[in-house]
């Protein structure tokens, strides 16, 4: 029998392309579980944190994407260790006795940031060294080319996936919830 899992749809916003030189500025997460009908479904719970900058790097282009300013993060962000302790505790509480599986839309970017920040904070990564990428999953499930796996195209192909709210895109918790819905649409499709 397969091990019970809880998927965690996670989205990261950052001040640049790599952690350590640049900052993870916000993180959103939404758990996904099997419902009583055996379908994958996002839970109503969510996690969101804005993180105080720990590194000097800030690319103008990256900062324009999510609209969080260095000044806002300096004043309102949570310290790195505290943010990662909060995420760890929340993840363990949501996963309970299941295995926590990291999911991202372009998971390598998001996982890289989260894994780095757990290590930087001196904490064990509750998601381990594995991640599920919804772009790759969409390629397989829908027989798509990589370039056709963006969220806009997937919203056209998956009738139950809502259109993106352009006012909320690049808010980490909005993106995490949207990705959770996308994950469920892909996982619940017939084989």
Positions of predicted regions on the chain:
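Active-site-proximal helix-loop-helix substrate-binding element of RNase H-like nuclease domains
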Residues: 50-73, 132-176
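Conserved non-catalytic scaffold segment of RNase H-like nuclease domains
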Residues: 2-108, 164, 170
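Acidic, Mg2+-coordinating catalytic module of metal-dependent nucleases/exonucleases
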Residues: 101-108, 112-113, 117-118, 150-191
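Short, surface-exposed linear patches
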Residues: 30-33, 70-73, 123-127, 152-155
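Catalytic phosphate/metal-binding cores of nucleic-acid and nucleotide-processing enzymes, i.e., regions
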Residues: 2-4, 14-24, 38-40, 98, ...
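Non-catalytic, well-ordered alpha-helical scaffold segments
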Residues: 81, 85, 111-112, 132-135, ...
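Residue-level signature of transmembrane alpha-helix interfaces in integral membrane proteins
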Residues: 27-29, 83, 126, 149, ...
């Amino acid at each position: 029998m397969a091990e019970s899992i809880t998927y965690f749809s996670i989205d990261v916003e950052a001040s640049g392309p790599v952690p350590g030189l640049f900052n993870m500025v916000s993180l959103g997460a939404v758990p996904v579980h099997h419902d009583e009908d055996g379908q994958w479904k996002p839970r109503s719970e969510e996690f969101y944190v804005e993180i105080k900058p720990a590194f000097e790097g800030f690319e103008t282009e990256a900062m324009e994407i999510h609209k969080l300013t260095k000044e806002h993060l300096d004043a309102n962000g949570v310290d790195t260790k505290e943010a990662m302790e909060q995420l760890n505790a929340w993840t363990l509480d949501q996963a309970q006795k299941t295995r926590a599986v990291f999911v991202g839309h372009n998971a390598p970017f998001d996982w890289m940031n989260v894994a780095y920040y757990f290590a930087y904070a001196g904490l064990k990564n509750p998601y381990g060294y594995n991640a599920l990428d919804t772009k790759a999953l969409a390629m397989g499930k829908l027989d798509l080319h990589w370039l056709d796996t963006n969220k806009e195209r997937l919203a056209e192909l998956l009738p139950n996936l809502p259109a993106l709210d352009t006012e909320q895109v690049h808010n980490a918790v909005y993106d995490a919830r949207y990705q959770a819905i996308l994950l469920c649409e892909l996982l619940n499709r017939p084989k």
